[in-house]
Amino acid sequence: MLPPKHCNINLTGPIPRWDEAIPLGNGILGSLFWGPMEHLRISVDIAGLWLRRRPEEKLDKEFTYAKLVELARKGDVAETRRIFDTPYARPTPTKIPAGHLFLDGLPRGSYQASLDLGTAVASFSQSGRTILRACLCMGRPVGVLMLPETYRDVTLTVERPSFGNGTQAAKAGNSVSPGSLQQLALPDANLETEDGMIGFFQKVDDRTAYTLLCKKCGTTLYYTAVQAENVEKASQLAKLELCAAEDMGAEKLLQQHKRWWQQYWGKSSLQLPDETLEQLWYRANYFLAAGSEPGNAPMPLQGVWCADDGQLPPWKGDYHNDLNTQFTYCHYLTANHPEQGKVFLDYLWSLRPQAAKFARAFYGTAGECLPSVMDIDGGALGGWPMYSLSPTNQIWLCQMFYEYYRLTGDKEFLRTRVEPYFTATAACLEELLQEGPDGKLVLPVSSSPEIHDDEAASWLTPNSNYDLALLHYLFHTLVQIEYQLGNSRGYWHAIESKLAPLSVDTETGLMLSPNETLKETHRHFSHAMAIEPLCMLSYENPQDRSVIDATVDHLVHLGSGQWVGFSFGWMALLQIARSNGNGALYELHRFAEHFLSRNGFHLNGDYKNSGVCDFHYRPFTLEADFLAAHAVQKMLLRSEKNHIEVLPACPQGWKNEPVAFQNLRAENGLLISYQRTADGKHSLTVKATQDGSWYLCNTHCWVTLQAGQTQSYQWMEENKK
């Protein structure tokens, strides 16, 4: 089922900024359409295009965990910053844009720009007449621009980004970006004007080059951007792509492209009595497919839409593994798009040699652990070290592997991917844990992202609840994995039994650490990891219920002054954990109204200055878009321990409204379709993709199915019979 029309992106131009642009993407390339119609700008990005070169000043020889622990215990903030945080202020390594095209010769004046999510085709019109259609073809690095005959004479020009020669002085840094593209020492590009093609070839570093080319064929214009290990190969591949596109022709390319999207949207859908939530969900699913294509680089902070304002992308467009990557890839499984999300797991798997190297070199341990702020090769970028170098963030990456197994039921993936990844991570953490005076295992130092920023107070008394929840999750899940694979030996259970219980205050719920509670509003709810996203506490358990209620109530009491965009989706999930659909709906509406650009991009701050938080900046990152979609799904479907419940957090205002969804994925690959009509009739259909048994909470019965089998149920609400 295609997305409803109100979920499309409809804008009135001229579009003044790149982060408000019409966003096209196919997981290989991304394009942003913006500016005045007579000089329309098309920003082009290539998935995985990085300037990998390290600066001449290498990481300090004391860039080690042992030194970090020593400085933390001394309270030496200045030296900690010098060694571990300073590297992040350097401009490289960084994600970089590929360049931009300018389409000249279209009429001046205002215009209507629309992105049809169902087909991923953009159209631009004036006075009701379409003057441009555009798409990025799924499966190939090619964009197509289609014009009516009236505008046959338009021209297309190509420009490289405003890379400098490395001599320009850096502007004063800030917490978001270390400066402009002018700081990057890149050689001049080579221009291409042969065979009707125009563009350039750009060497980036010793490992990377790319080409941006376009060709005008009557009223159709094709463009491509390709990266390779050298200029010659990038040039050859780009020319082949353009020739193949021209040979196939725009209409055939468009037909293939539309078929791909029709199949994609057929995998899941929903219909809600709330257009805002529908829009959040459908746009997030569009961003997922547009940004994450099997065989290509996974989405960094901005996906395939790198900044095009002359500056380095926000936070260098890196991979932040202390929240951002995990939230970016949190919703895809329930949405029944496992192929798009597995891109990130395949990427993490490919980095295992680097993770082992980093565990040895930085932590001095066996096993594997990636830095929490890293470049595309898994190299440490620095940053506030209590978070950017926290070893427990690696466990959050482990959870992503287990969630894939949990929601697909793929036993081979459990055996060949999940178990090895967990075991290698545990080998690193096990060496770092030390036995305290009470016999409990603690880390040498502990923190809770990003409490107390990078001040001395950010080093909490071990173990913080953030670290402790993740450690419990790691060893407890290893016990479950061994049981599921039939080789239980009790080793991991023995380690988990030596971890202290979570620190709880009767008034405020989950604490930051054994001796500190959260006393002020903060964007990260890292102390509440045990509730969400680890789901270690259950509202069905009376003791857990009191902890969940106290924790969430305390966060509400502290207010949203220091929240950012992702905080609202996270709070929605915390409300859903206690079946508070009204609370979840409230937070998702606040997020949608105050933190999204008009094209759906999440801009982190209350950039409209509406008063919902103290941050008024607008750096674009995608993770909160996906987190909000995840919260929408959790309002509709709960799937834990093979118990399935539909509408576990239904807002009061939906009680007499139609609600439906199709093929949302539950545990062990069970696909759930559900409909409730306004007159109280409920229809539930479950389809197994794996053999298994599930308890259906709404019908109070177990169902046992073999792969491919379907079972349906119907019932009426008691008060409407």
Task: Label each residue range with its predicted role.
Residues 81, 342, 415, 419, ...:
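Conserved positions within tetratricopeptide repeat
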Residues 300-318, 366-416, 430-493:
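The feature captures the catalytic groove of carbohydrate-active enzymes
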